[in-house]
Amino acid sequence: MKDKRIDKMRKLELLVPASSLEVLKTAVRYGADAVYIGGEVFGLRAKAKNFSLEEMAEGVEFAHEHGVKVYVTANILAHNADIEPVKAYFNDLKQVKPDALIISDPAIFTIAKEMLPDMELHVSTQANNTNYGTYNFWYGLGAKRVVSARELSINEIKEIRENIPEDMEIETFIHGAMCISYSGRCLLSSFMTGRDANKGACTHPCRWKYAVMEESRPGEYMPIEENERGTYIFNSKDLCMVEHIPELIDAGIDSFKIEGRMKTALYVATVARTYRMAIDDYLEEPKKYQANIPKYQEFISQCTYRQYTTGFFFGKPDETTQIYDSNVYEREYVYLGIIGEKVAENEYRLEQKNKFYVGQTIEIMKADGNDIEVEVVSIKDEEGNEMESCPHPKQQLIINLGRELEPGDILRVKSEEKQVNS
């Protein structure tokens, strides 16, 4: 049989999430080939900022100006009451003109195909895509791409590639949070809080602390592990495959997907630029990629994360995939904000995200990896009043870092606390 795996010199897609217009622009600037976003409905991320139709249109225009695609999620598991609103929503999307829709429900897929016949359709991981028969089924219905279930190994993905049409694309999550439930189909949130994970309102009870109680001893709660804090039995580590780009390419994956439609611009920029470097280095020269793995490891650890694992890629996860004794993030840097428009020499607008002060040494995070340490020269409020520090999140500021900056640059500072509660 002809080998249908991707030639390593082919341009691969790095697909990055965005929770807002600001984060979409960050994803584009820091290396995304495509960005996936959600509207205010039907997108499985109720707590994300998400996009109004106007913001979506602006985001699509910005991305297309930079040669980047935009995919819109509509991947809820639909009930009867959702059908007519979905039709109205798709009618609105005709004006937005995204590059593809990401869908999991067959009814929504059928509606999209009828209403948006020229739109590329991708099948969400929520559809539990675990075998090549499923891929061929969706291809027969008109899907261009299928997102593989997180439960697949590298070898299983490779076998799928060899048994589907050459023009069908495989998209795979290669970085980010992992759900303890099968491809995200979780009922814990609905049962415990009344908030439906399959409608985008998950409260993440998998991250909570649990203990056991023996039925003849009501009220006596015993930790499952010998630890006074209880145990986090459902608490998965985060997926990270930056050290395994060759294996991912060899498996025939077309699109490398980053999880995180609720993440900050700092997280998105950190992960996007690290994978951009890794992919480009490998395609340029595999030896260069191998030599730079320590750099990728360093860079990918500069975002907030929950320790790393390779998930299911190299076999079924064992006990090392879980975090049993805490529910904390590792944090190397604190996000300060994104540089806005220039207002005077060396002075720029900034919406502050975390506290910093005059005289403090901070970092300008650059898309090419050549970050710059600078000292904060001055901070002013919107009226031009000098400030020594800015303790209030989302305050509109004018800052001077003693040099010219580029709008869109991300500012960050080394974190004093290396672990923070989630």
Residues covered by each model-derived region:
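Gly/Gly-Pro- and Ser/Thr-rich, intrinsically disordered tail segments characteristic of DNA damage-repair
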Residues: E84, D118-T130
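Surface-exposed amphipathic alpha-helical tracts and adjacent flexible/coil segments at the periphery
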Residues: K2-Y30, A34-V41, G59-V60, H66-I76, ...
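Glycine-rich, positively charged N-terminal anion/phosphate-binding segment
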Residues: R45-H64
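Alpha-helix capping/helix-boundary segments
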Residues: A107-I108
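Short beta-strand elements of ligand-binding domains
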Residues: V72-T73, I103, V123-T125
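Glycine-rich loop at the start of a catalytic domain that most often binds anionic cofactors/ligands
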Residues: A48-L53, A81-Y89
